[in-house]
Amino acid sequence: MIAIVDYGAGNIFSVKNALDFLGLESQLTDDAAAIQAADAIILPGVGAFPSAMQMLKERHLVSVLQTESKKKPFLGICLGMQLIFEKGYEFEACDGLGLIPGTVEKIPANGLIIPHMGWNKLEYQIDCPLLHDLGEEAYVY
């Protein structure tokens, strides 16, 4: 079973629907015991780094995520991926889960629209097996 962490800051239903489509057993949960019993963990997220960390703290999920991430596959999606770093600087400096060394810094705009949302052509910098079936000039969102 895959635990999809429900801490009030994620697009959890699209993740659940994707796993259902793939025929994978999953559960939306904010329960530490369910996360501990899971075979894998997905931490989705939408919103701001500081408020998301506060919601994880309020649900007493920080230590369970830190512990369980060392034992089983763990995937952070969007904000959830940012939260796995040591610190984030969105709005204010805020400690993250510390699963990966490093910080999440604001990208300087330099005349660009940030955040950018829309379709773009992939430009490969390195060979990546995950992208082989997409083609050399695939458009992605």
Model-derived regions: residue spans:
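N-terminal beta1-alpha1 ligand-phosphate binding loop
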Residues: 2-24
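Short, flexible loop segments at the rims of nucleotide/cofactor-binding pockets, characterized by
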Residues: 18-25, 51-55, 117-121
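Structural alpha-helical scaffold elements that stabilize or flank donor/cofactor-binding regions
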Residues: 34-35, 68
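An anion/phosphate-binding loop that grips the pyrophosphate of nucleotide cofactors and donors
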Residues: 38
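Structural motif
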Residues: 42-44
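Cysteine-nucleophile active-site neighborhood
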Residues: 47-117
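Active-site oxyanion/phosphate-handling segment shared across diverse enzymes
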Residues: 119-141
